Amino acid sequence: AELLREKIKGLELKGAEMIRHGHENTAIADRLQRWTLQLLNTREAAELPEVAASGIAAHFGVPQATVKLWGVAPDFAALPCAQGASADAPAFATSLSKPYCGANRGLEAATWLADPAAAASLALIPLRAGDGPQAFGLLVLASPDPQRFAADMGTDFLERIGELTAAALSRLLPA
């Protein structure tokens, strides 16, 4: 009987944990929905990089977020997001098959942030047009918390955020 009670207790704890994860995922999905609506309601393409980054910061509590793009249409080449990436940045972003999450080990992308020294952990999310293999940009999320973006974390929601950001920002690419 004691063994059965222990098994039941273990199952109750697992069930409670599953419910908690479900609630967390629902909350993330709600924030994702609000941020997506913010992107869709942005009429001016030139405003999209700032709306995307500031919206992620606000809706998801990310202390720092920025976007860097390359190969944009001439009308958008003067935007801050289209300036300052090295010649290596496109190849680095394209090499990422999924978001990089981990420590800021002096990566170039951290220098694009307002306060690079405060970026202990990073999520670097490649931006691709549709199913194309080449990245046309990088979404950079940063936190002073070294565990916020850890190498062992799941990246499903970050991948969705990257897909949505890329879809919105593809308006800045040449026709």
Listing of model-derived features with the role each one plays in the protein:
Residues 74-102:
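Allosteric regulatory "coupling" segments in signal-transduction proteins
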Residues 99-121:
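Signal-transducing coupling segments at domain and membrane junctions
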Residues 120-131:
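A short, aliphatic-rich beta-strand micro-motif
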Residues 143-159, 169-175:
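Regulatory loop-to-helix N-cap segments in sensory/regulatory domains
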